[in-house]
Every structure is written in C-alpha cells, then in structure tokens.
C-alpha cells in the first residue's frame, strides 16, 4: 500500500529510488506482441507478431507493428500503438528537417537519440506520463553501416546485433543468443526470426496474417539501400518455404478468413 504514495506522478521517486510510472509503462510492453530485430552481414530483418487480426482487415494495407521513418530507417514497435504513432510522426519530421537542412539523410543514431530524449523528458515533468512503447530501430548510414537499436519508455537506448521486445522477450532473447551468427545473411536472419517467433508466440500456430516482416538491404546492382515491407502473400510463401507452415495449413487458414 505504501508504494501508492509514490506512483501518482512520474516525478516522485520511491524510497528505493524507483519511478513506478516508468515501471508500469515497461510492464505494459511485456504484454504486447513480440517484435524482433536481427542484423545480418548484408542487411537487417525486422519481424513482429500482430495482436489484432480480423477477417475485416485489409491485409495489404494495414500495419500494426512496422513503420517506415525515411528511406533508410524503419522501426518495429511493442506497446501502445497510439503512443507509437506520436513518436513516429515526430521522427519523420526530424528526418525530413535534417534532409532539408543538410541535403543528406539523418544518421541512424542521431534520430534514435532525439526520440529517446523526448521519451526521457516525459519521465521528469509533472502532468505527463511515460510513453508506453518500445522501439526497435533498423537503419543504415554511410558512417556506421547497418545499425540496430532499441529504446524503452525510460528514454534509454542501446545498440544490438539481435534483439527482442514485447511478450516472451526472455525466451526469444535466449533463442537469438543461441543461434545468431555474425556472418549470417538476410535470408538466414529471416529463418531465425521465424524460428524464434514460432517458439515464443502465444498462439498455437504461426500464420501469415499474424506476422509483419521488413528488410533493409542494399540493391545487388546499384548499391542503393532499399527498405521492403513484405506483403501477406510473400510472408505466406516464406512460411511454406521454411517448413514452419505447411501449404495445406495455409489454405485452411485462407478458408477460415473467407
């Protein structure tokens, strides 16, 4: 009961030095759909489990977990979608202002730091609450190449080779740590992401309508960085190719959605 004296405002520390509102925000993320980021030698893979599925959703246009910030940076989100939308729009504005001012794309870490500063500010001002969302940032710039970061509601951000946020993150992180290799390619990273999600997802079967996938990699011919968000049919084909979902199971899932 004593803790309730310290959790009504974000600016009040408990006797143990804890900010309960930040901890509550972190707890809300642990119930969100799992999101995974894996950095390969030739690109980055983002994968996420959707929590909202419905036969009424337009599968080709609706996104819940993956968003494009600019041509070279994308994010996967875990937590409150409304909070994520505010930060995503802010990130896009920062990226465009940087491009307008310097005539080049914003470096990945600079954008991550700016968004993390905003998150941190919401933990120390009265009348505000922390953003209830964690991000996995995937991007590329000429100075550091491919980069993968996470940030949480406290405003802390860290760089990773492979990371999971959301539900069952401890189990997912253990699997990633066991199977990740520094020299793996994007195709291998896609298989690892699917394997991890298939073993940690709360649903009984991993189906294409519950997944979102994106990659960031250089084009084979021109060397330009391209960002791709996979369509449902492409995700279905990958599931069949990797053997995680059999073809007849996908056909049954399609029948259920009709």
From Swiss-Prot:
**Do you know which InterPro entries this protein is assigned to?**
Ntn_hydrolases_N, Proteasome_alpha, Proteasome_alpha-type, Proteasome_asu_N, Proteasome_bsu_CS, Proteasome_sua/b
- Cite the Pfam families for this sequence: Proteasome (PF00227), Proteasome_A_N (PF10584)
Where is it predominantly found? cytoplasm
Q: Which GO terms describe its biological process?
A: proteasomal ubiquitin-independent protein catabolic process; proteasome core complex assembly; proteasome-mediated ubiquitin-dependent protein catabolic process
Where in or outside the cell? Answer: Cytoplasm; Nucleus
Return the GO cellular component terms, semicolon-separated: cytosol; nucleus; proteasome complex; proteasome core complex, alpha-subunit complex; proteasome storage granule
* SMART domains, per the entry: Proteasome_A_N (SM00948)
Q: Where is this cross-link: Glycyl lysine isopeptide (Lys-Gly) (interchain with G-Cter in ubiquitin)?
A: 100, 199, 231
Q: Which UniProt keywords apply?
A: Cytoplasm, Isopeptide bond, Nucleus, Proteasome, Ubl conjugation
Entry similarity comment:
Belongs to the peptidase T1A family.
Report the function annotation for this chain.
The proteasome degrades poly-ubiquitinated proteins in the cytoplasm and in the nucleus. It is essential for the regulated turnover of proteins and for the removal of misfolded proteins. The proteasome is a multicatalytic proteinase complex that is characterized by its ability to cleave peptides with Arg, Phe, Tyr, Leu, and Glu adjacent to the leaving group at neutral or slightly basic pH. It has an ATP-dependent proteolytic activity.
Additional info? Present with 17100 molecules/cell in log phase SD medium.
Subunit relationships:
The 26S proteasome consists of a 20S proteasome core and two 19S regulatory subunits. The 20S proteasome core is composed of 28 subunits that are arranged in four stacked rings, resulting in a barrel-shaped structure. The two end rings are each formed by seven alpha subunits, and the two central rings are each formed by seven beta subunits. The catalytic chamber with the active sites is on the inside of the barrel.
Q: Sorted alphabetically, which NCBIfam families does this protein's record hold?
A: PRK03996.1 (NF003075)
Entry's PANTHER family?
PROTEASOME SUBUNIT ALPHA/BETA
What name does the UniProt record give this protein? Proteasome subunit alpha type-3
Species for this entry: Saccharomyces cerevisiae (strain ATCC 204508 / S288c) (Baker's yeast)
């Amino acid at each position: 009961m004593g803790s309730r004296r310290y959790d009504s405002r974000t600016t009040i520390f408990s006797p143990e030095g804890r900010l309960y509102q930040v901890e509550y925000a972190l707890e809300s993320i642990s119930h969100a759909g799992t999101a995974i980021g894996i950095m390969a030698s030739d690109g980055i893979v983002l994968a996420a489990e959707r929590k909202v599925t419905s036969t009424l959703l337009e599968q080709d246009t609706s996104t819940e977990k993956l968003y494009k910030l600019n041509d070279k940076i994308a994010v996967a989100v875990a937590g409150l979608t409304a909070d994520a939308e505010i930060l995503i729009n802010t990130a896009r504005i920062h990226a465009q202002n940087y491009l307008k001012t310097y005539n080049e794309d914003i470096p990945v870490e600079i954008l991550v730091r700016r968004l993390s500063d905003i998150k941190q500010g919401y933990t120390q001002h009265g009348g505000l609450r922390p953003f209830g969302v964690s991000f996995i940032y995937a991007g590329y710039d000429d100075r550091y190449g491919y980069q993968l970061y996470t940030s949480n509601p406290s405003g802390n951000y860290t760089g990773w080779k492979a990371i999971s946020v959301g539900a069952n993150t401890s189990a997912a992180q253990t699997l990633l740590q066991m199977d990740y290799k520094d020299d793996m390619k994007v195709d291998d990273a896609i298989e690892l992401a699917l394997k991890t999600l298939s073993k940690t997802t709360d649903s009984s079967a991993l189906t294409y309508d519950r997944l979102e996938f994106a990659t960031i990699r250089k084009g084979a011919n021109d060397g330009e960085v391209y960002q791709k968000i996979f369509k449902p049919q492409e995700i279905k084909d990958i599931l069949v190719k990797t053997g995680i979902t059999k073809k007849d199971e996908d056909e049954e899932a399609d029948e259920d959605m009709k």
